[in-house]
């Protein structure tokens, strides 16, 4: 009896400790996760786009562990707990496409991973160009869902649509582009995807 209670106690401690790392135990393949990055450009992205969040990725489960497929340097899979802890205050929001039980079939998820594979190892796109040679976080998620599932999550905008007058933003633009800011460049922002009516919020810690 004592041994049984000990095993139960150990099991409970293990479950609690696992949940404490993420704060959420209901992740599913294909979930989209958002956070505020602590990178040097994060504040500029937030101001320019009017967003609380500056980084995002797609959640996948592999061998009973969850990972985030993300565009950093380079594009790669990152263990979920590491990804969460890397964000500001370990805060994150999980969103899921509507009707995911119908749209995210095993075949669709396989296609998403296949599409994502062609970006694996590519450099992070500091210039936010709409090309496949380099790629940034929201562009990666948008293109995977577009090509694999046929969903356009969020509205494409031009760089000129954002708030480019703030001093923090202007400084970052000068660092990247000098006097040749590509104001007509197509961009998909984390904010646009976060507010898409194709997504529902599953969890926020």
Q: What do these predicted regions represent?
A:
Residues 11-18:
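Hydrophobic h-region of N-terminal signal peptides that target proteins for export
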Residues 2-10:
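Sec-dependent signal peptide recognition
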Residues 1-2, 20:
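Generic cytosolic/nucleocytoplasmic N-terminal low-complexity/intrinsically disordered segments
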Residues 18-205:
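Cysteine-nucleophile amide-bond enzymes
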């Amino acid at each position: 009896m004592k041994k049984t209670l000990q095993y139960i106690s150990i099991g409970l401690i293990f479950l609690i400790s696992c949940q404490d790392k993420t704060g959420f135990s209901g992740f599913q393949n294909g979930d989209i996760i958002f956070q505020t990055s602590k990178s040097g450009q994060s504040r500029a992205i937030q101001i320019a786009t009017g967003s609380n969040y500056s980084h995002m990725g797609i959640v996948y489960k592999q061998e009973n562990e969850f990972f985030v497929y993300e565009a950093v340097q380079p594009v790669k899979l990152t263990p979920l707990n590491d990804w969460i802890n890397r964000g500001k205050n370990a805060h994150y929001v999980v969103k899921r496409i509507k009707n995911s039980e119908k749209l995210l079939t095993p075949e669709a998820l396989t296609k998403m991973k296949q599409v994502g594979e062609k970006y694996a190892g590519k450099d992070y796109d500091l210039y936010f160009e709409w090309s496949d040679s380099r790629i940034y976080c929201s562009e990666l998620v948008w293109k995977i869902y577009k090509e694999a599932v046929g969903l356009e999550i969020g509205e494409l905008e031009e760089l000129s649509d954002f708030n480019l007058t703030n001093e923090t933003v202007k400084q970052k633009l000068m660092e990247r582009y000098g006097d040749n800011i590509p104001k007509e460049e197509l961009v998909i922002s984390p904010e646009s995807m976060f507010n898409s009516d194709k997504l529902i919020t599953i969890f926020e810690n």
